[in-house]
Amino acid sequence: MNGMSGSSPAAPAPSPSSFFQHRHRHGGMMHMTFFWGKTTEVLFDGWPGTSLKMYWVCLAVIFVISAFSECLSRCGFMKSGPASLGGGLLQTAVYTVRAALSYLVMLAVMSFNGGVFVAAMAGFGLGFMIFGSRAFRATSSNSHTEVQSHC
């Protein structure tokens, strides 16, 4: 049926091995296990590149994103109060931003770079310590503060 009314045969899908060969020919390497090194790609094609300075910038960005995500998760920007559409929209917007940031961190960790993983966990840990733990929370002596959960 080739050649009938402008139809063309379907092109075969590229094999997984051809994808990895393409990445290798163009200088990129897709890791499937954790590795340590400054030459990696995180979130965007070619970022942070091969520069040690840009790698440290990348780690700092991942650290800040994960800490800020924890801040949004733990700070309780919307205290309990009367039901309102405006309050619900604001709460939904904050939740959506927090979810997006968390997914960005997850995708960054999927680069399998050990430094990115450590930066993400350190950011989440520091974010929890500042915004979720008892370390920086002012409480009265007769009240007990429970750690808020994500749910």
Curated annotation (Swiss-Prot):
Its main location: membrane. It is found in: Membrane. It is a multi-pass membrane protein. One of its GO terms (cellular component) is membrane. It comes from the Eukaryota. Keywords: Copper, Copper transport, Ion transport, Membrane, Transmembrane, Transmembrane helix, Transport. The chain crosses the membrane at residues 52-72, 103-123. Pfam families: Ctr. Involved in the transport of copper. This is Copper transporter 3. The gene is COPT3.
